[in-house]
């Protein structure tokens, strides 16, 4: 990398002292430093705070992007040492995707990797010993003076699933969707205890110890115990009463649909590589997508046999490795932190000699001149992996069938998405009087949101989740000759192929 021979890249991208004139104050700037000052809102801070509470003293609680307060403590030498240690082919995973010339790819990798010797790299995972009792943490978040901080706190209630298997972690992923859905006993208990509060449930599988988080926002610091008790009450009700099989099957189907539609991403190669690499880094396995696909199918048989209840009881309700972290906005703390930094920099300048001040001033001017230069053309050319002429021109021709039966026109086409179907249904409103069109729009909007003669509202929601990846019904128009349009009610849905049978 260029920063091995050009320290100014570290100063530009990480941080540096800046002095615009001999009488001006010293400031700190840098691309990452400036970005991270604006990147952390109270919700992101609350997540890191909960991690610090549940994983005391661990790197898991660190901000991977860099804490603005800590970034200026990073030295150029530390960056080089970190890169030499961990950015090594022995600690790398290469993912190839697409219609590639594998021979050319392997030659390129061999020419690069052959310069290195294989070595064992000890990568700390940040894991901690399971806690024997729940813990609590309180953290302050800086906001401007005069800010309204009432109902501005964020409460995180987390559980660490120590010893959970790959299958159980996948099950917790499904379970969190259930717990955050409308009608779940946990959500109902929280809404009753804290009316108007925001509520979410999530699972973090990015570390060796999986974490499940219940979060409330729009609350006060004093609501922490109320929130914890409400979550526990809801979990106890779920363990006592069990889970709705249809609802679980719906959530599993939604997960299967999402997995199958991953190929629809415009950045499918990078998306797959990132997903595979993230699971490899945690599990040491490369088969996550296949594993998850088969596991979701197996979960259907467990939906009505108490397996999800056992997960909730073992890893949530009766789990001692849990904790509550309260992140509280403090008005005026932002200005205080800025004033403290300005004072430290002023003290630093006061301790400098005139020679040191002039040296920093000259360094600032030299840096501005250097960074204004354009990159050499030779460097730009060296970064080009392919030429424009080598890029393929891909024109995909999708055969379309157009048939009419009994006055109904059917258009069908095949896609390259395995196991998923899309249906669009246009119902003409030609014979509906103009004054009644708004009623058609209203009725369409209510489709799937009300009970029927045979199903309750909850059952309709569960079946929709199970069989429909997405659903829309509403008014639309079809252009005809000239300025004329035909009003229609358009129904559109996406589902898995086996559910079309």
Please annotate each region the language model reported:
Residues 14-16, 23, 27-28, 33, ...:
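Non-catalytic interaction/regulatory segments
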Residues 106-122:
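Glycine-centered hinge/linker elements that transmit conformational signals in sensory
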Residues 62, 84-90, 148-151, 205-210, ...:
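Short, flexible turn/loop "capping" segments at secondary-structure junctions
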Residues 155-246, 406-411, 415, 421-481:
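Structured mid-domain segments that build the active-site/substrate or prosthetic-cofactor binding neighborhood
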């Amino acid at each position: 990398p260029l920063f091995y021979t050009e320290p100014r890249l570290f100063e530009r991208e990480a941080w540096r002292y800046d002095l615009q004139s001999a009488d001006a104050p010293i400031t700190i700037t840098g691309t990452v430093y400036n970005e991270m000052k604006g990147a952390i809102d109270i919700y992101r801070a609350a997540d890191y705070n909960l991690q610090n509470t549940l994983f005391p003293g661990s790197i898991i609680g660190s901000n991977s992007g860099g804490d603005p307060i800590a970034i200026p403590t990073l030295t150029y030498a530390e960056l080089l040492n970190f890169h030499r240690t961990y950015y090594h082919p022995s600690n790398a995973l290469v993912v190839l995707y697409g219609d590639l010339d594998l021979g050319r790819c392997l030659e390129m990798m061999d020419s690069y990797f052959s310069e290195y010797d294989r070595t064992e790299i000890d990568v700390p995972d940040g894991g901690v010993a399971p806690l024997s009792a729940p813990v609590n943490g309180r953290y302050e978040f800086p906001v401007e003076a005069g800010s309204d901080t009432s109902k501005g706190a964020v409460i995180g209630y987390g559980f660490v699933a120590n010893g959970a298997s790959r299958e159980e972690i996948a099950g917790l992923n499904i379970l969190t969707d259930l717990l955050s859905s409308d009608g779940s006993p946990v959500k109902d208990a929280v809404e009753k205890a804290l009316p108007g509060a925001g509520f979410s449930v999530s699972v973090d599988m990015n570390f060796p110890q999986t974490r499940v988080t219940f979060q409330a926002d729009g609350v006060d610091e004093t609501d922490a115990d109320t929130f914890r008790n409400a979550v526990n009450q809801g979990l106890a009700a779920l363990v006592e009463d069990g889970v709705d099989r249809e609802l679980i099957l719906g959530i599993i189907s939604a997960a299967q649909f999402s997995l199958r539609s991953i190929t629809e991403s415009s950045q499918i190669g990078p998306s797959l590589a990132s997903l595979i690499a993230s699971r490899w880094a945690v599990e040491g396995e490369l088969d996550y997508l296949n594993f998850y696909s088969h596991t979701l199918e197996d979960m259907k048989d467990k939906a009505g046999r108490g397996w999800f209840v056992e997960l909730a009881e073992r890893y949530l309700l009766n789990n001692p490795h849990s904790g509550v972290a309260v992140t509280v906005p403090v008005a005026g703390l932002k200005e205080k932190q800025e004033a403290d930094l300005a004072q430290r920099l002023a003290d630093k300048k006061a301790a400098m000699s005139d020679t040191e001040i002039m040296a920093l001033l000259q360094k600032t001017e030299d840096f501005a001149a250097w960074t204004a230069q354009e990159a050499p053309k030779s460097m730009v050319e060296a970064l080009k992996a392919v030429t424009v002429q080598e890029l393929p021109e891909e024109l995909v021709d999708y055969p379309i069938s157009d048939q009419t039966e009994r006055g109904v026109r059917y258009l069908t086409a095949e896609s390259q998405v395995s196991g998923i179907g899309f249906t669009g249904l246009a119902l003409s409103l030609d014979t509906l009087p103009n004054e009644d069109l708004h009623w058609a729009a209203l009725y369409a909007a209510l489709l799937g949101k009300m009970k029927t003669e045979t199903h309750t509202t909850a059952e309709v929601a569960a079946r929709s989740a199970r069989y429909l990846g997405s659903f829309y019904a509403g008014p639309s128009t079809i252009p005809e000759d000239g300025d004329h349009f035909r009003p229609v009610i358009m129904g559109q849905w996406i589902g898995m192929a086996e559910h079309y049978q």
